[in-house]
Amino acid sequence: MSNIVLNTLRFKHPKLALLQSCSSFSDLKIIHGFLLRTHLISDVFVASRLLALCVDDSTFNKPTNLLGYAYGIFSQIQNPNLFVFNLLIRCFSTGAEPSKAFGFYTQMLKSRIWPDNITFPFLIKASSEMECVLVGEQTHSQIVRFGFQNDVYVENSLVHMYANCGFIAAAGRIFGQMGFRDVVSWTSMVAGYCKCGMVENAREMFDEMPHRNLFTWSIMINGYAKNNCFEKAIDLFEFMKREGVVANETVMVSVISSCAHLGALEFGERAYEYVVKSHMTVNLILGTALVDMFWRCGDIEKAIHVFEGLPETDSLSWSSIIKGLAVHGHAHKAMHYFSQMISLGFIPRDVTFTAVLSACSHGGLVEKGLEIYENMKKDHGIEPRLEHYGCIVDMLGRAGKLAEAENFILKMHVKPNAPILGALLGACKIYKNTEVAERVGNMLIKVKPEHSGYYVLLSNIYACAGQWDKIESLRDMMKEKLVKKPPGWSLIEIDGKINKFTMGDDQKHPEMGKIRRKWEEILGKIRLIGYKGNTGDAFFDVDEEEKESSIHMHSEKLAIAYGMMKTKPGTTIRIVKNLRVCEDCHTVTKLISEVYGRELIVRDRNRFHHFRNGVCSCRDYW
């Protein structure tokens, strides 16, 4: 339709001019009604412009039923053209039902309307969203049939689709055959390698790129974070800043999450300062990441401060602060935040209840915990999951209600997993209940036969009861199943640098000689106040002298010695480790906090331990 005819239509029907200023779904429906009454909907040009408003993401906030409404408009168009079909294919390719985009493509071909280079990128997008390479390959054959295989936009879509579906070799072949590669082509390959876990290949391609944009940096940093290369994610962010590239909220979420996993508080604080100084919009995702990072790095007070200052919150951000308070041992404060969350109208999710029940467990709030567990389904319609069952078992076990905990496990609607059984076995050790421990331990070894920690825990329970023949049987079972203990490691951040110490690999650190001498000094001081090595958690197939030597080389002891060496007196020492703290290390850390007057914060696999003046926040139950 010519501009003259369009202007004539606008002159005769002034409401058509409102199409460009439509600002809400209500406006759209009013204009739609006008077009129906005036029969202008029968004009394909006018109808297509109305349809375009439905699919344009920048026009107004879209209701959930928008796709259905768009299809209703489409059904009123008598002779839809290629522009209309492309709009619908685009709309559905990025929606909840991307497969429906192919229905419009089939209808388009039946109407003898042929696709163009706009059609295929959206069809490829749909197959990528479906993560169905078979549909993608069929679309690829259609691309070749209609001669668009050398179009750069189509090629970029194919590279992205194959990479997103995990077919990185196919993506690489198309990339290699491209006559022209733009930043999108390169970034799609980087993203594909990251998704397949091939971060070294991704970095190699990233470094080869002639030009990079912010999205490329974001993809590579996020790729490192998603593949547990947290230090590399932080290093690349530092390199990005040196290159003069300004980060956005997406980049900072990846960086801050990496700090959280490493327990890198110093760098996390610098990242937070960067967010503030850059005047970034602290949206829900970034805000929750900041809260999560601070409590995971051991600074629960800063986490509370950031949470209280968030411009907006949702159920996930509330769940994060509640979980943080729970693992730091602030049960009553966690319950206060949970009550506040409910009173403000936020709907708790399953992760919220995991956090709240964990708080009840750590705080010994048995009756309250059972009440919340019962109300979870009754008042909020949330079915219990393994995580919730685990919290209840842990809570009952901590309270010494071992029979109730075992009975709860037997009545569960699902098969118990290793963490649930492990929680009860740990309680059996604390309360020296060999009878329940044997039943639970045998179940546990069947569920997780390769986990060395459960054998050691059960053997310690037998040792306390003097049942040496059963210890011998466990030792034989471990040898038969080739069970090996995973290497323990501990991280400590000094001057913004992460230092990693690994059990049995103590010669890698360049200052290991000084560290060992510092540890001997610490050992001498804590022995003066009665310390004797507790070898209970050491493997039971070595002699006592070897056990004594091995426990003094545990990774957290080396990390603590290094921290004492490198920081001023009175400085808080923060350690992150991958395994549960053993009894000897727990005792040693309490004594160090008493002798040296320092606070030590240790994050292990289960929780945070705050050591002050010879006392731990876990109250010796972990």
From Swiss-Prot:
Protein's GO biological process: RNA modification
InterPro entries recorded: DYW_dom, E_motif, Pentatricopeptide_rpt, PPR_At4g14850-like_plant, TPR-like_helical_dom_sf
Segments of this protein annotated with the region Type E(+) motif: 496-527
Highest taxon listed in the record's lineage: Eukaryota
Residue ranges of the region described as Type E motif: 420-495
Region (Type DYW motif) residue spans: 528-622
Keywords, alphabetical: Repeat
GO MF annotations, alphabetized: RNA binding; zinc ion binding
Swiss-Prot/TrEMBL PPR repeat ranges: 81-115, 116-150, 151-181, 182-212, 213-247, 248-282, 283-313, 314-348, 349-384, 385-419
NCBIfam families per the UniProt record, alphabetical: PPR (TIGR00756)
Family: Belongs to the PPR family. PCMP-H subfamily.
Protein name listed in UniProt: Pentatricopeptide repeat-containing protein At5g06540
UniProt source species: Arabidopsis thaliana
Gene transcribed to yield this protein: PCMP-H88
